[in-house]
């Protein structure tokens, strides 16, 4: 009698389980990479919004003031808030722009400006 060659049922099941484990691991890794790319995209857009606000609001204005607004990018609404405070030693004004991402996370960008002690006005360095 001729002996047939091939895989037994046990070998087929083992090969299928190994393939399934590898496929699930790859899918999980790809999902993690996709989430990381989305977070980096949102972080970059938030920093662009904050930088644009710092550039458009070139003068610092009064200390201990706040303002806020919204930007629409790619159909998503991004909220920003500008806060101006003086430093503890009174030589610098600090403007912080905080952008709230659509997911609820926040990103901040800060700019410092020296204060001219004679006039009390802020001046760029």
Curated annotation (Swiss-Prot):
Source organism superkingdom: Bacteria
N-methylmethionine modification, residue list: 7
Spans through the membrane: 7-27
GO annotation, cellular component aspect: plasma membrane; type II protein secretion system complex
Disulfide bonds: none
Record note on modification: Cleaved by prepilin peptidase.
Subcellular location: Cell inner membrane
GO biological process, one term: protein secretion by the type II secretion system
Keywords: Cell inner membrane, Cell membrane, Membrane, Methylation, Protein transport, Transmembrane, Transmembrane helix, Transport
Residues making up the propeptide: 1-6
Induction comment: Silenced by the DNA-binding protein H-NS under standard growth conditions.
One Pfam family recorded for the sequence: T2SSI
Membrane topology note: Single-pass membrane protein
Subunit comment: Type II secretion is composed of four main components: the outer membrane complex, the inner membrane complex, the cytoplasmic secretion ATPase and the periplasm-spanning pseudopilus. Interacts with core component GspG.
PANTHER family: TYPE II SECRETION SYSTEM PROTEIN I-RELATED
Family (UniProt): Belongs to the GSP I family.
Functional summary from the UniProt entry: Component of the type II secretion system required for the energy-dependent secretion of extracellular factors such as proteases and toxins from the periplasm. Part of the pseudopilus tip complex that is critical for the recognition and binding of secretion substrates.
Further details from the record: Part of a cryptic operon that encodes proteins involved in type II secretion machinery in other organisms, but is not expressed in strain K12.
Name assigned to this protein: Putative type II secretion system protein I
Species: Escherichia coli (strain K12)
């Amino acid at each position: 009698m001729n002996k047939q060659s091939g895989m037994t049922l046990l070998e087929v099941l083992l090969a299928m389980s190994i393939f399934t484990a590898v496929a699930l691991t790859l899918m999980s890794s790809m999902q993690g990479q996709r989430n990381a790319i989305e977070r980096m995209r949102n972080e970059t857009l938030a920093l662009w919004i904050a930088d644009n606000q710092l550039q458009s609001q070139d003068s610092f204005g009064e200390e201990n003031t706040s303002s806020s607004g919204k930007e629409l990018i790619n159909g998503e609404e991004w909220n920003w808030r500008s806060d101006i405070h003086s430093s503890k030693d009174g030589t610098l004004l600090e403007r912080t722009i905080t952008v709230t991402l659509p997911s609820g996370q926040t990103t901040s960008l800060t700019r410092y400006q020296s204060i001219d002690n004679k006039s009390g006005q802020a001046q760029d360095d």
